[in-house]
Amino acid sequence: MAAINTKVKKAVIPVAGLGTRMLPATKAIPKEMLPLVDKPLIQYVVNECIAAGITEIVLVTHSSKNSIENHFDTSFELEAMLEKRVKRQLLDEVQSICPPHVTIMQVRQGLAKGLGHAVLCAHPVVGDEPVAVILPDVILDEYESDLSQDNLAEMIRRFDETGHSQIMVEPVADVTAYGVVDCKGVELAPGESVPMVGVVEKPKADVAPSNLAIVGRYVLSADIWPLLAKTPPGAGDEIQLTDAIDMLIEKETVEAYHMKGKSHDCGNKLGYMQAFVEYGIRHNTLGTEFKAWLEEEMGIKK
């Protein structure tokens, strides 16, 4: 049984995927490094972790993802140039990419054997501790919720208080494309957690246990590690994280947490384009001008 007083301070972000849904843009650039206005996608996910109180982040990478590692490393030459040219605001932005109190590490996933395997690759670094798992394709809209209080931050608080693993969910129209949780029909409001009894991967609409799909945020007790280690290959001959979660549900209480606000699936072209527009019109310096241009292009009268 998970130790209730163990705090979640470590997160695993799997970034080894090849991003085939975003080709040809991702042929030479990791999908996680595609920009969302003026920051790469991975930066938003890391910022979310930091806002939630995470201090150690493990990126599970691939040999083609060196630019992600470089992004979070110190660039002495760039910083010296910005200092020399008195570009103080840009220098501050570059230096804030990875705050001093946060450690970002990398481990390699040598073979593409599924999400469960990717998380397991981080076990030697995380150790036998509870962990947050964050899928970088999904961006939680920072304009629709408070990253320091809601969603991942709230899931971590809930785990720290109860010892119950947390799986983030949100209602979807098409359940056949997602992992769907079974909460025995209990109604769930945004910000609430209730015990779940199982996960069904991509169910048929007429037999789906709910319309609550997993969003891509998990806070898991340390008991997940031995279960992942013994999880056999499942769909696609890959080690599935949901299979290990099903075993965890048999062992202890696992709760579904209803996301606050909205999410953006930036792992597909339409979702990425929608996120870019929404973040563009809300940007603190470019938003007003961009929105005016967009309205003019669309023929929208003020």
UniProtKB/Swiss-Prot annotation:
InterPro entries the UniProt entry points to: GalU_uridylyltTrfase_bac/arc, NTP_transferase_dom, Nucleotide-diphossugar_trans
Keyword Nucleotide-binding part of the UniProt annotation: no
- Enzyme class per UniProt: transferase
The protein's matches in Gene3D superfamilies, at most eight in alphabetical order, are given as: Spore Coat Polysaccharide Biosynthesis Protein SpsA, Chain A
Pfam families from the entry? NTP_transferase
Its GO biological process annotations read:
colanic acid biosynthetic process; galactose catabolic process via UDP-galactose, Leloir pathway; lipopolysaccharide core region biosynthetic process; osmoregulated periplasmic glucan biosynthetic process; UDP-alpha-D-glucose metabolic process
Task: List the GO terms this entry assigns under cellular component, sorted alphabetically.
Answer: cytosol; protein-containing complex
Q: Which UniProt keywords apply?
A: Magnesium, Nucleotidyltransferase, Transferase
Q: Which GO terms describe its molecular function?
A: identical protein binding; magnesium ion binding; UTP:glucose-1-phosphate uridylyltransferase activity
Q: Its family? A: Belongs to the UDPGP type 2 family.
Question: What is the name listed in the Swiss-Prot or TrEMBL entry for this protein?
Answer: UTP--glucose-1-phosphate uridylyltransferase
Source organism of the structure: Escherichia coli (strain K12)
